[in-house]
Amino acid sequence: IANCLVGSEMCIRDRSDDKLNSFQDSKNEKYDTIIDATNHHIYPGIIALNTNLGLVEIDAVKASVDDDESGSYLPEIRSIIAYNAESKAVESMRPNGVLLAQIAPNGGVISGSSSVVQLDAWNWEDATVKYDQGIHINWPSPYTYGRWWLDEDRGLKVNNNYSSQVKGLKDFFEKSKANMNVNKSMNIKSKAMKSIINGESTVYLYADDEKEIVDGCLLYTSPSPRDSS
């Protein structure tokens, strides 16, 4: 429901052939406009959230996969730069009522920033509705599976490196904050972290269980990462 309310376009679907026959900008429509919707379904445009749409064309072709960069801490990665507005996958979305999408990166601990695009555009600049609207963080898991290639039991077990992985993420926050306070010529990673540390940017935290959610929220809301003093 929330996604539909945000959409700025209205779709009209013909019940007889189940196809979208009309797209109209709901912001510019006058309240006295009369639309003959007989035998039609009317609903707002849908937004695809947290998707690699336009970043991946064919999974098996490495050259067409741009949603996952090498490295662990990559806040400077901007998924919008790699967005392909002419992707065949993008073209298939509008006829099905999906008019906007949140293009998000994958991989690493800090994957990078996502942007919101509208799906009727010639290039990524034309498509962009909102630049770099949030940073995506994959929280470490307190559990892990055995590595079969090392002849380990494949069952679920406690991740003995969980504390050090969390500490690494916390240290990265603190280092970025320190660079902001003392170094005017910050490196690219610290610049990308500035909006998070100042509380100006949305953080999307990926977590699988209660402990990860609590630990992630405690890190981000603790005085250390966001203290502006």
Placement of each model-derived feature along the sequence:
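N-terminal-biased segments
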Residues: 43-55, 166-177, 218, 222, ...
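Short glycine-/small-residue-rich flexible loop motifs, especially phosphate/cofactor-binding loops
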Residues: 2, 90, 217
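Metal-associated gating/positioning segment near the N- to mid-region
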Residues: 37-96, 101-104
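Short secondary-structure boundary/capping segments
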Residues: 2, 26, 194-195
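Histidine-rich, glycine-flanked metal-binding segment
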Residues: 8-9, 13-43
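Polyanionic/metal-chelating signatures
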Residues: 95-219
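Single conserved hydrophobic/aromatic residue that forms the stacking wall/gate
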Residues: 1-7, 12, 220-229
